[in-house]
Amino acid sequence: PEITALVETGTVNSPVIEVNPGPCFRIAGLNLAFEGRSAEQDEIQEAMSEIGVSEGDIAIPAEIIDVERQLSQFFQNEGYAFADVSNRRVRGDREAATLNITYALDLGDRVRLGETVLPEDSETDAEYILDLQPFEQGEIYAPSKLSSYAARLNELRTFRIANVRLSDEPTGESPEGDAIHD
């Protein structure tokens, strides 16, 4: 954009700011580049159809940035617990007023839920706590499964705080080749 500031003189001096915003840029291309493991083609197509922008849309910076969150969330819901957009590359063509955007995505391993491990110093009935678990061992990870379990535990009002999370490191590998996290 071009911004010009000037003062008009006359009986009363008045400031004038003229703004020429330039051309309205549109999205010409949206791409994913995977660092390490790549997703399946059908997952990629579904992810691209669910994000909030598409080719031909007006390029609104806040929406372009929010796609990072949407992509991370989509792939986490597909079982890639540690999926994260690590970089965004934007290439613009001033003459055509278009942008090509590439999101670099690090999926990590697909995660299956392992054994639920309670704190060693827990005085609670372990069997009862495990019965509240809304998933089976070996299921594909989804953030909603862990948050649902935490909500169930908090509803008991037995604990000051109930924290449900994946182990930092995998504890095994499933027959399908997915990482198992307790």
Residue ranges and their predicted role:
Residues 1-182:
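Periplasmic polypeptide-binding modules associated with outer-membrane biogenesis and secretion
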